[in-house]
Amino acid sequence: AATATDGENTVLSLFATYTDQGATGLKPLSSAATVNLRSNIFNARELTERTRIALKDSTNSGFLVYPENNGWLKLNKIDLSGISHIELMNLSKGEAGNYTIELRLDSEKGLLIGKGNFIDNGTFNLQKNASISIKPVIDRKLHDLHIHIVSDSKNVKQRPLIRSIKFIPAKLL
């Protein structure tokens, strides 16, 4: 059976059971397993572990405000197997700025697995995504992902907003 919840924190839960008939002198075999699959899109409101990155929630849709100087946010227990890059869905608030984005494993100073830039040209309400390639993570473990954002342009008052973060899988050959 498959179930999914509506709204944020969407998880697909797959539950399966198996029982055979057994045979003369043998007990039936049975087993059960559950797998929970998270959505590959995290909305801004779901990203609660952050430093110097504020939540702007006046529209009931939730956005994260890029930091004035630097800041980070953290996603817990993410399986990055098969992920080639992430996309930050951004919305300009009308003032130009340049931002450096780093992706680190398990801690603020952890292994650097991706680095990119977001250049906000200052066009008000323009949606522009920042795509950052990720070095392959092949250990099949769950990791905490730290996303560091550094503003190259200081004193920007109308900083861009993050609507969501999307994990993009590698293309299969």
Language-model region placement:
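Extracytoplasmic
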Residues: 1-173
